[in-house]
Amino acid sequence: MKKNKKIFLLISAIIIISLSLIFKYKTNNEKVKTPKADEISSITFIRVINDRGVEKREVYKKSHINKFLNIIKDSERTKKISTSNFPDKEEFIIVAFKIKDGGFIINSIYEENNSIYFEQAFNDIFKLNYNDNLYLLLDNISQENNKEDISVNIEDLLDSDF
């Protein structure tokens, strides 16, 4: 009888630990993954129309970086999966997080059916809980005078340091 009780307790413990790990993985997988604000030196936003970068904005202020990260973190994972570097849209915005230790993390934002989506390349797509349009979102994060008109092919953008 004692042997059966020990086996039952062991199996119960294994099941509880397994379920806990599955639940932890599931809940962490539902959230958008972004670098921490302290790891980011700047965020570059590049408006792309028909595979050409046409407008560039850069955000350096910690308060603006935090504001953008909070908007992104307050999003809902969709059932859609990203299958490329950029969305298959005529118009979207490249979001390049410049990391203090070097390198970039590149994502994109686009508008579809009056909703704004944050796409992590070859990963997940998240719907932002943001009521205004995409350009008002950018205006709220960076100053209007921070815009720079550019004309660059999207392939050349990937080879640059933004």
Q: Residue spans of the language-model regions?
A:
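Function-determining sites in protein domains
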Residues: 2-12, 18-162
